[in-house]
């Protein structure tokens, strides 16, 4: 019964689910929990978790999540769009900080729609990021997007490079 509830009514999602199951290593033991994880068609939380980890410098955790998306052949364009959106939101936050607002005032600003559970992450991001670093990362992201579209078979290699670039922007102090 639990498996039935997890399946979507959308036939494309069901087809994707069967593809994910067939891509699993044949020698690997498949238990019920692993099967539930594979057929769970709601990857949104994991994507946001991956991007948040990346944006606060947890490269290894974010890259492991990225590998999971590569295994299920998740759209690189969707990942890039969400990273770009996070950078744009962070730009707004930094501009507000430069206009004299405190971190608390920024994360509680209704126009930004920052979820309460993300407040501590944004506090960290505001410590790590500057407008110039974001601009440099957005430029690299746009180049990555072009590469992913023109050389689709290498899209996850380009995403890996982008993740490394973002990580080094956070960790290397000018």
Predicted regions: what is each one?
Residues 58-174:
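Helix-rich C-terminal "collar"/helical-bundle subdomain used as an assembly and partner-interaction module
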Residues 1-49, 53:
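Long, charge-dense, solvent-exposed interaction surfaces that engage phosphate-rich ligands
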């Amino acid at each position: 019964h639990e498996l039935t509830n997890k399946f979507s009514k959308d036939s494309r999602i069901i087809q994707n689910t069967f593809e994910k199951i067939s891509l699993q290593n044949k020698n690997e033991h498949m238990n019920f929990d692993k099967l539930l994880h594979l057929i769970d068609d709601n990857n949104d939380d994991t994507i946001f978790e991956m991007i948040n980890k990346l944006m606060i410098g947890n490269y290894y955790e974010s890259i492991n999540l990225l590998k999971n998306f590569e295994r299920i052949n998740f759209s690189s364009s969707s990942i890039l769009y969400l990273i770009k959106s996070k950078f744009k939101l962070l730009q707004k936050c930094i501009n507000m900080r430069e206009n004299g607002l405190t971190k608390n005032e920024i994360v509680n600003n209704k126009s930004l729609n920052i979820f309460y559970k993300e407040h501590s992450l944004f506090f960290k991001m505001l410590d790590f990021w500057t407008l110039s670093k974001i601009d440099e990362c957005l430029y690299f992201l746009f180049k990555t997007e072009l590469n992913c579209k023109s050389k689709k078979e290498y899209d996850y290699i380009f995403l890996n490079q982008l993740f490394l670039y973002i990580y080094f922007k956070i960790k290397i102090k000018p």
